[in-house]
Amino acid sequence: MVNNTSNQPTSYPIFTVRWLAVHTLAVPTVFFVGAIAAMQFIQR
């Protein structure tokens, strides 16, 4: 997948502060949305 001879990332630094901020918000959000959606179908 890496076609360059150098190991420098050309224009895609993946692990950035933006990536960290997006994932610290997105991972619990997806978890809680799935948990709340599952709670809607629990019958007592």
Curated annotation (Swiss-Prot):
It is found in: Cellular thylakoid membrane. SUPFAM superfamilies: Cytochrome b559 subunits. The keyword Electron transport applies. This is Cytochrome b559 subunit beta. It comes from Crocosphaera subtropica (strain ATCC 51142 / BH68) (Cyanothece sp. (strain ATCC 51142)). With its partner (PsbE) binds heme. PSII binds additional chlorophylls, carotenoids and specific lipids. One of its GO terms (biological process) is photosynthetic electron transport chain. The gene is psbF. It is a single-pass membrane protein. Keywords: Electron transport, Heme, Iron, Membrane, Metal-binding, Photosynthesis, Photosystem II, Thylakoid, Transmembrane, Transmembrane helix, Transport. It comes from the Bacteria. Heme binds at residue 23. The lineage of its organism: Bacteria, Bacillati, Cyanobacteriota, Cyanophyceae, Oscillatoriophycideae. Belongs to the PsbE/PsbF family. One of its GO terms (cellular component) is plasma membrane-derived thylakoid membrane.
